[in-house]
C-alpha cells in the first residue's frame, strides 16, 4: 500500500502563527497612561536682535533685568512637591419589610352549596430585604518631581508636565505628573505643592518581573470571564 504524507499548507501554518500571536498578545493587558500630553517642551528660539552696544541684552533668556526667576515661559522648569494623603470611607444600609394578608369567601348558589360550601380563599405574603455595605480607601504619595512648562494659558497659568524614570535591577519605575500651576503659588525655592496644582494627574507605575508577577495570566482571565459566579 502506498502511503501519502500530507504536509500542512501555507494557510494552516499562517493560521497557527496568527493564533499563537493572538494568545501572546493576551498575556499582557495594555494600559494607557492617564497623562496623554507631552512630558516636556522646548522653548522657542529667540528672535535674532541687533546688539544695542550695551552690557545688558534685553533679549537674553527672555527675562527683564529686575524680574525674579520664577518659571513663566514654555521650557522653564519647576519642582513639584507631591504630598497627597486621601482617605475615604463609605457605608450604606437598607432594610425593607412588607407583609400582606387577604381572606375572602366565594359566594355560591343554593344548589351548589354542598359542592362549594367551604370554598374560602386566603392568601398571605411577606417580603423582607436587608443589606449592608461599606468601603474604605486610603492613599498616600510623597515625593518630588521636576516638571517643564509646556504651555502658558492666556490668564498666565502654567501647564506643566514631567516624567521621572528609575531603572532598579530588572524593573523600570516611572512617575508622571501634569497639571495647571498658578505662578503666585510658586515659592522662592521654585517649588509648589501638588495640593495647589489644578487638574493634577499623578501616575506611578512600573515595568518588569515584579509587575508581570502581579498580572493575571491570559488563560486564567479567560476562564474567569466564562465563570458565572
Swiss-Prot record:
Cell location: Cell outer membrane; Bacterial flagellum basal body
Keywords noted in UniProt: Bacterial flagellum, Cell outer membrane, Lipoprotein, Membrane, Palmitate, Signal
InterPro entries in the cross-refs: Flag_Lring
Any one GO CC term of the record: bacterial-type flagellum basal body, distal rod, L ring
Membrane topology classification: Lipid-anchor
Signal peptide positions on this chain: 1-25
Keyword Signal: yes
S-diacylglycerol cysteine lipid modification positions: 26
Alphabetical list of PROSITE patterns matching this protein: PROKAR_LIPOPROTEIN
Molecular function via GO: cytoskeletal motor activity
One BP term from GO: bacterial-type flagellum-dependent cell motility
Lipid attachment points (N-palmitoyl cysteine): 26
Stretches that traverse the bilayer: none
Role, per record: Assembles around the rod to form the L-ring and probably protects the motor/basal body from shearing forces during rotation.
Self-association state and partner proteins as the record states: The basal body constitutes a major portion of the flagellar organelle and consists of four rings (L,P,S, and M) mounted on a central rod.
PANTHER family, per the entry: FLAGELLAR L-RING PROTEIN (PTHR34933:SF3)
Similarity field: Belongs to the FlgH family.
HAMAP family to which the protein is assigned, alphabetical: FlgH
Name of the featured protein: Flagellar L-ring protein
Organism: Burkholderia vietnamiensis (strain G4 / LMG 22486)
